[in-house]
């Protein structure tokens, strides 16, 4: 922590009851600092936590031409998930951009969608 602060970073501790960052508290703190946009880049657990909390407005998904499979294969989105396609989040205002061999899929999440409910 001291090294980060010495480098000019502001460090906040916002632990929730499970020891993880309390996401609404984080966003409230960012708002108080007049930060109104946040890029979340992380693994499946991080993506799932923000989606489950209904805190995602836009998705940028990078798709590489590689196929993974198997019951234990990693998923790009963790969290609660959905059992059936009808419960999946639907993205709107889609754009697709080719980046070399990869594809960038961008879309907006409807404001009323909340996976945890």
Task: For every predicted segment, state its role.
Residues 1-117:
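Enzymes that bind and transform nitrogen-containing heteroaromatic metabolites
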């Amino acid at each position: 922590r001291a090294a980060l602060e010495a480098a000019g970073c502001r460090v906040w501790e916002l632990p929730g009851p499970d020891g993880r960052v309390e996401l609404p508290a984080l966003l409230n703190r960012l708002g108080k600092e007049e930060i109104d946009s946040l890029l979340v880049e992380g693994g499946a657990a991080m993506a799932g936590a923000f989606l489950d909390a209904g805190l995602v407005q836009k998705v940028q998904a990078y798709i590489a031409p590689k196929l993974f499979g198997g019951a234990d294969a990693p998923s790009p989105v963790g969290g609660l998930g959905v059992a059936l396609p009808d419960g999946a989040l639907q993205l709107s205002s889609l754009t697709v951009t080719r980046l070399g061999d990869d594809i960038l899929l961008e879309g907006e999440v409807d404001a009323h969608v909340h996976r945890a409910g």
